[in-house]
Amino acid sequence: PIRIKGKQLTKNEVEVDGTISSQFLSTLLMIGPVLENGLRITIKGNLVSKPYAEMTVALMKHFGISVSWKENTIEVAHQKYIPQPYKVEPDWSAAAFWYSVVALSKDAEITLSDLQKNSLQGDSVVPELMKQFGVETEFLKDGIIIRHSAFNIKHSTLNIDFIDFPDLAQSLTVLAAALDLKIQFTGIEN
């Protein structure tokens, strides 16, 4: 067994290497308001997966937290979260697997509930990316319908930069292999 004994943090400034992962930043953002002196975060390097950090800030604002983000500096003062209802939106990266099923089928049609076009998730680029794999998306009021299109993708060489949505790399890598496509993936270092 492991025993971890915490202590009260005394400093309110921290530097985060933005080139590794946005998860460290999101964690610090969420604890910032409960720290006695708040938190000032300086991001070193280019922030990968920035949409995930932006989603964290939007969620914090929903619960009453004021966040100041200017260039590579984020400040969160000591504040209280205000509990209130929140509907968690479905996961676009999970939807990518269903898009892959449709891309590999000739006449598949799948309805996915509650996915929204104007999502905060960086992975919400799935509909645009999957056009290249022969999948079209119809946005409905309460979700989406995805269908195989007649687009012939066998003659395409694709270049995809995953820097803002690295969680999609796994499903698209397998799909590209299954379709025997030539694709160059970048931005998956983290």
Where on the chain are the PLM-derived regions?
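Short, structured segments at the rim of ligand-binding sites
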Residues: 1-190
